[in-house]
């Protein structure tokens, strides 16, 4: 083999090695974003219309965790007539509020039996009070787990009202759109299923003003609780959904 031929042969070997290295690096990086070595356990806090319904599915898909929306969980347990669902329905039919213990046990049931929760969870709609937060911490401690972040979506009330009065919902999935800020590809139609979108009857300024007042009254102590634990992160939710998502990813990437 001449010198020039040997040189070409070595170059081809180097090229093959570089291709192999690139392939292995891609494989190594690929699963990391989808199945993180460290589990993600986070809570998403925000007033109605702040973007929880947009961001929570992104967290779920990016980190392969389960999205635990407590309202949906409660309805599901009631429909399936589970022991927890039967107990909850009895309380609701009597006009009462479902107890903190029942809600925490519903979350615990998901963590124990929902395969999608094996890498962690994003919790949406709970806790709303400090006692609920304490019970949640206690349940996680029993499982030798703990929260690693609490993200609050921050937005001015008046901007929020203008957002919500244009909100459109896909009833079956909970996917949300907005007539101006995040419109569906076809007006009034869900992008994925082609089914019609609706506007909730309580998405009006008067109702929203009352709901926001309740939200601020409830949330303040819970936020202070998590701030004291060093878990709280605030994100400006007045920005576009993609910018909000980038901010949230930065928080999750920096978790310990």
Curated annotation (Swiss-Prot):
Write down the chemical reaction(s) this protein catalyses. AMP + ATP = 2 ADP
Family annotation (InterPro entries)? Adenyl_kin_sub (IPR006259), Adenylat/UMP-CMP_kin (IPR000850), Adenylat_kinase_CS (IPR033690), Adenylate_kinase_lid-dom (IPR007862), AK2 (IPR028587), P-loop_NTPase (IPR027417)
List of residues binding ATP: 49-54, 167, 176-177, 239
Cite the binding residues for AMP.
70, 75, 96-98, 125-128, 132, 200, 211
Q: Name one GO molecular function term.
A: adenylate kinase activity
User: Which E.C. number(s) belong to this protein?
Assistant: 2.7.4.3
Region listing for LID, in residue ranges = 166-203
Question: Main EC class of this protein?
Answer: transferase
UniProt cross-references to Pfam families, sorted A to Z: ADK (PF00406), ADK_lid (PF05191)
- Where's it found, cell-wise? Cytoplasm, Cytosol; Mitochondrion intermembrane space
Q: Where is this region: NMP?
A: 69-98
UniProt cross-references to Gene3D superfamilies, sorted A to Z: P-loop containing nucleotide triphosphate hydrolases
Q: Which domain of life is it from?
A: Eukaryota
Q: What's any GO biological process attached to this entry? A: ADP biosynthetic process
> Has keyword Nucleotide-binding?
yes
**Keywords for this protein:** ATP-binding, Cytoplasm, Kinase, Mitochondrion, Nucleotide-binding, Transferase
Q: Which PANTHER family match?
A: NUCLEOTIDE KINASE
Its UniProt domain note says: Consists of three domains, a large central CORE domain and two small peripheral domains, NMPbind and LID, which undergo movements during catalysis. The LID domain closes over the site of phosphoryl transfer upon ATP binding. Assembling and dissambling the active center during each catalytic cycle provides an effective means to prevent ATP hydrolysis.
Per the record, the similarity remark reads: Belongs to the adenylate kinase family. AK2 subfamily.
Q: What HAMAP family does the entry give?
A: Adenylate_kinase_Adk (MF_00235), Adenylate_kinase_AK2 (MF_03168)
Q: How does it assemble?
A: Monomer.
Q: What is this protein's name?
A: Adenylate kinase
């Amino acid at each position: 083999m001449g010198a020039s031929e040997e040189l070409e042969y070595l170059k081809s070997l180097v090229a093959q090695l570089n291709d192999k290295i690139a392939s292995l690096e891609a494989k190594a990086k690929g699963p990391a974003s989808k199945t993180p070595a460290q589990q993600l356990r986070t809570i998403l806090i925000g007033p109605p219309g702040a973007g929880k319904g947009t961001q929570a599915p992104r967290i779920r898909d990016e980190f392969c965790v389960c999205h635990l929306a407590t309202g949906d969980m409660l309805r599901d347990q009631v429909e399936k007539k589970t022991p927890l669902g039967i107990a909850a329905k009895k309380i609701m039919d009597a006009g009462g509020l479902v107890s903190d213990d029942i809600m925490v046990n519903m979350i615990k049931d998901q963590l124990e039996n929902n395969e999608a929760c094996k890498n962690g969870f994003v919790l949406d709609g709970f806790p709303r009070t400090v006692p609920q937060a304490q019970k949640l911490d206690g349940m996680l401690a029993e499982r030798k787990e703990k929260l690693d972040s609490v993200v609050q979506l921050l937005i001015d009330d008046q901007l929020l009202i203008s957002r919500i009065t244009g909100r459109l919902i896909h009833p079956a999935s909970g996917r949300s759109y907005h007539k101006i800020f995040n419109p569906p590809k076809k007006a009034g139609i869900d992008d994925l299923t082609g089914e019609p979108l609706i506007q909730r009857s309580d998405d009006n300024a008067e109702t929203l003003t009352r709901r926001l007042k309740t939200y601020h009254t409830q949330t303040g102590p819970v936020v202070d609780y998590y701030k004291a634990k060093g878990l709280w992160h605030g994100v400006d939710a007045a920005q576009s959904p993609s910018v909000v998502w980038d901010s949230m990813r930065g928080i999750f990437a920096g978790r310990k």
